[in-house]
């Protein structure tokens, strides 16, 4: 493209170097902003007509032209040109080509600096809403599983060593709680995304009396940005979203690690559906948990995008710099990666099959009811530190003879403490242990059912909002 054909070419005498033109272009990736760019342009044009800067006929031509361009893009028929650099210039050039002189008036009172910042916020606002819906879908799957397995006993771990018995339903509700925090963070992030830069122009605002409140209302923003310099240079909202996404994926990675462990022969706690696993090219017996493994790996990718955005912004003076073009690809890939991982998990979890007998057998190993014995002694007047010492000796006694605490005869237990009576065996069963944790937030089956009921109320309210 000759320099005369560039929309900004008036000041230049020489054409842009062909390599530089390709190197600086962003249309290959920022064209995903097209629908938001068109929406922002229609709102801007509507405001210009209200001010008398466009005639009614010019506004109608611009709106119909932009809508036709949107249809072209949707149909895959739009003639994108790298020489026009980005999504904004491609759409504006096409508009002028279609409707003539009126198209040249659209950019009145506007810069690509406030235009792109507005587009990205519109895009991200939409994606946050969609991602929040995906989180609710996954949470619903977890709550369904928790309800079915409210009384299924499994070992709880600390340091990956058997610690105390819990229920599988309680474990699923722990995952649910992590995702609830993720949902709330994203909704809070959306508040700061939902601020309109349009009207800030290049950096100093516009000499036209733009009605920014009116434009913000048309675009469903909470209001216009308060400072024009900040409006065009701010990418905090993108960084904050990447941080929120990183936390979601950190949680999904933790879930994945547990699923991977639980499907192994060494645990055998669950079976994943074949549709979410693959085999080996050499080992016929293998059923590999590829989906959770890949989600665990993809979390690192999004963590990298967060640091890329932080590093991108850390040395930039006010206001806009070309560096900011590099915010799109990490942001877009963060959205895509998070969306894919949430969908995979939500599709997979309804089909997870727990192996109840394997979980129960594992919970009987590792002296999981030792704390219950200590609590029993405390209730009979033994100071906790003394009770801890006594139970430690009981565990050693069991280890030396390969017996569980529940299998040690009463006489031997009484040799460690005279307050131990025949009723001790009620607290040494796995069922008794989990049933004893009946306070709010506990692992008792009744507590899990109450947590499930509360979660369903919350999910119904959020899905209906």
Curated annotation (Swiss-Prot):
GO terms for molecular function: argininosuccinate lyase activity. The keyword Amino-acid biosynthesis applies. It is found in: Cytoplasm. InterPro entries: Arg_succ_lyase_C, Argininosuccinate_lyase, Fumarase/histidase_N, Fumarate_lyase_CS, Fumarate_lyase_fam, Fumarate_lyase_N, L-Aspartase-like. It catalyses: 2-(N(omega)-L-arginino)succinate = fumarate + L-arginine. SUPFAM superfamilies: L-aspartase-like. Belongs to the lyase 1 family. Argininosuccinate lyase subfamily. NCBIfam families: argH. This is Argininosuccinate lyase. It comes from Methylococcus capsulatus (strain ATCC 33009 / NCIMB 11132 / Bath).
């Amino acid at each position: 493209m000759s320099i005369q054909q560039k929309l900004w070419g008036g000041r230049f005498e020489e054409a842009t170097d062909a390599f530089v033109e390709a190197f600086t272009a962003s249309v290959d990736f920022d064209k995903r902003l097209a629908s938001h760019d068109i929406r922002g342009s229609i709102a801007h044009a509507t405001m210009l007509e209200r001010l008398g800067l466009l005639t009614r006929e010019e506004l109608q031509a611009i709106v119909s032209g932009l809508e036709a361009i949107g249809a072209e893009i949707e149909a895959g028929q739009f003639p994108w040109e790298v020489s026009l650099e980005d999504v904004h210039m491609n759409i504006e050039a096409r508009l002028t080509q279609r409707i003539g002189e009126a198209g040249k008036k659209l950019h009145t009172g506007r810069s690509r600096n406030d235009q792109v910042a507005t587009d990205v916020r519109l895009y991200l606002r939409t994606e946050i809403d969609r991602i929040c819906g995906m989180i609710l879908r996954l949470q619903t799957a977890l709550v369904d599983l928790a309800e079915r397995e409210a009384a299924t006993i499994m070992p709880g771990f600390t340091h990956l060593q058997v610690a105390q018995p819990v229920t599988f339903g309680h474990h699923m509700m722990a995952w649910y709680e992590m995702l609830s925090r993720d949902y709330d963070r994203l909704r809070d992030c959306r508040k700061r995304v939902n601020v309109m830069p349009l009207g800030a122009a290049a950096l100093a605002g516009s000499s036209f009396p733009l009605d920014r409140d009116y434009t913000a209302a048309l675009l469903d923003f909470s209001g216009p940005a308060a400072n024009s310099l900040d409006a065009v240079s701010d990418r905090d909202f993108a960084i904050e979203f990447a941080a929120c996404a990183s936390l979601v994926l950190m949680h999904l990675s933790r879930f994945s690690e547990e699923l991977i462990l639980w499907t192994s022969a060494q645990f055998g706690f669950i079976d994943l559906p074949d549709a979410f696993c693959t085999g080996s090219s050499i080992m016929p017996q293998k059923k590999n948990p590829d989906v959770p493994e890949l989600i665990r790996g993809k979390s690192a990718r999004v963590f990298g995008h967060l640091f890329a955005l932080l590093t991108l912004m850390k040395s930039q003076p006010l206001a806009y710099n070309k560096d900011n073009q590099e915010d799109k690809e990490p942001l877009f890939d963060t959205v895509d990666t998070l969306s894919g991982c949430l969908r995979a998990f939500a599709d997979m979890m309804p089909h997870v099959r727990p192996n109840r007998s394997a979980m129960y057998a594992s919970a009987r190993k590792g002296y999981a009811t030792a704390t219950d014995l200590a609590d029993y002694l405390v209730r009979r007047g033994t100071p906790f530190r003394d009770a801890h010492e006594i139970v430690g000796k009981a565990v050693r006694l069991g280890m030396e003879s390969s017996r569980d605490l529940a299998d040690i005869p009463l006489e031997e237990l009484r040799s460690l403490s005279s307050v131990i009576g025949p009723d001790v065996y009620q607290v040494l069963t796995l069922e008794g242990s989990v049933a004893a944790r009946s306070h709010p937030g506990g692992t008792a089956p009744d507590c899990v059912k109450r947590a499930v009921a509360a979660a369903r109320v919350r999910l119904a309210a959020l899905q209906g909002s």
